[in-house]
Amino acid sequence: DLARDYEKKNLGYAPQSPLVIAVSNSGQVARVGEAVRRCRKAGAFTLGITGHEESVLGQSAERILKLDIPKFESAPGTRSYMVCVMALYLLAIRIGEVRGRYTMDVASARRKEIKALADALETALPAMDDTAFAVAQQWKDMDCYDFAGSGFEYACAFFGQAKVFEAIGRPAMYINTEEWLHLNFFVNHPEKIGTMIWAAEDNKADSRTLET
């Protein structure tokens, strides 16, 4: 817990170091504010990524990266999450660029890749929406839900669990794909559990995921 138990010796061991980045679109999460204030007091340099400069996070961090998310219909926090992740990607690209890890051309190409994702998503969404609706119709009365992923897909599993809590308040669990085989595989009445497994072809765990 960065707000309480994180070793102080790892904070402020050099002037304005390390860089501590806190992310909260609302900026009102109390523990995030506490963590930032503790890190800042210990000598770390703090950056808040938030949509509200006047929030707890906005007032606690030394610098703010302001998010501007257009208003849209109310829904579980998917857009805010995507914008926060995009901000972190862009920040990482910029840090690598100024540190000379790659050229300006490479940095520019990576930014364009991120921008192009919006067009790709717009193209894919209609079919995805139809599929998701069909699955939702089949799964609406499930007792609980499992979300399994490995590597970079593990975060997707975590996000899936969070959205089930937020949207419908049903029991859900996120788990590593390998661990699912050793634990959740033995749960009774699997027909009452909606199980979603991420299986990207470029994931190094792809072969094991297919076995699952």
Which sequence ranges carry the predicted segments?
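A ubiquitous structural signal for well-ordered alpha-helices
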Residues: 35, 117-120, 135, 160
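Ligand-binding beta-strand-loop-alpha-helix segment within the catalytic cores
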Residues: 112, 116-119, 123-129
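A short, well-structured juxtamembrane/interface segment
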Residues: 124-141
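Anionic-ligand anchoring segments at beta-strand to alpha-helix junctions in alpha/beta enzyme folds, i.e.
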Residues: 1-20, 140-190
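A general structural signal for well-ordered alpha-helical packing
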Residues: 132, 136, 157-161, 210
